[in-house]
Amino acid sequence: MKKIISILLLAGVFAAGASVSFAADTAPKSVIHVVTVAFKEGTKPEQIAAMLEGVKKLPADYAGITHVWTNAIKVQNPEGAKVKKTHVIVMEFASEKALKDYTDSPAQKKWYELYLPIRDVSTTYDITN
């Protein structure tokens, strides 16, 4: 009987360790940088497309960016919003340091040449665990 209880306790300890390990695996330390954007009146679709292509090149231009997403499936604007945001850009940074170092980097400056002239307003969220 003691052997069975010991086995059950040991199994419980392994199960608890596995669940803690699984939780850690689902909580990465990368930083997700989410930008919702409204473009200036008169911005042409070609300008937006060029800006989005520039975003897609950022992981090659800046090692701290691991992934980007540019295809917003759904964009919600608050009821009565004066400026309607139409696009969402998401960049995944390897770490908080990578995000901080991106500020004023050559890669950011290059992308800003495409982005800032057409941006009306944007809201940014930086998220990590």
Please annotate each region the language model reported.
Residues 51-52, 68, 92:
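Non-catalytic interaction surface on structured domains
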